[in-house]
Design a protein with these regions (language model features):
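Hydrophobic membrane-targeting alpha-helices
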Residues: 12-16
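Tandem repeat scaffolds
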Residues: 17-146
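Sec-dependent signal peptide recognition
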Residues: 2-11
């Protein structure tokens, strides 16, 4: 199984996409994955800690309990992704798009989220209001009215 995950990582680095891959618990820590496509893939429990994910596309991906701590994911798309219990501590998420994503129990502690796309429902179902989120003024009124 370890060799399969290593081969998948080599494929990723060469072709910037995952096609019908199952990469549960894969480790992408500190990797440059800018512009990669992870659409509709099962990446549950995967770790992207410190990864460079600018404009990466996670649309429709299963990212339950994934770790994005300290990741740089400006412009990343998480449209329709399942991110329940994921962590974005200290992540840069400027212009990240979370439309229709499931964010139950997601942590955004000290995340930078200027111009990120989040709905009121997503803010209330995540731990957003409990976390100190940097530059999230446009969301603050939603937390006050819980």
């Amino acid at each position: 199984m370890i060799y399969l995950k290593f081969a998948l990582l080599i494929w990723l680095l060469l072709y910037n996409t995952i096609v019908n891959a199952n990469c549960v618990s894969c480790n992408f820590d500190n990797k440059n994955l800018a512009n990669f496509e992870f659409k509709n893939q099962n990446l549950s429990n995967a770790s992207f800690q410190g990864a460079y994910l600018v404009n990466a596309d996670f649309s429709g991906a299963k990212l339950t309990s994934a770790i994005f701590d300290d990741a740089y994911a400006n412009g990343a798309s998480f449209v329709g992704a399942q991110l329940d219990n994921a962590s974005f501590r200290n992540a840069e998420l400027e212009l990240a798009n979370f439309q229709n994503a499931s964010l139950k129990g997601v942590t955004f502690e000290s995340a930078y989220m200027v111009h990120a796309e989040l709905s009121k429902r997503q803010i209330l179902e995540s731990k957003f209001c409990d976390n100190a989120v940097k530059d999230a003024m446009k969301f603050s009124s939603m937390c006050k009215n819980q």
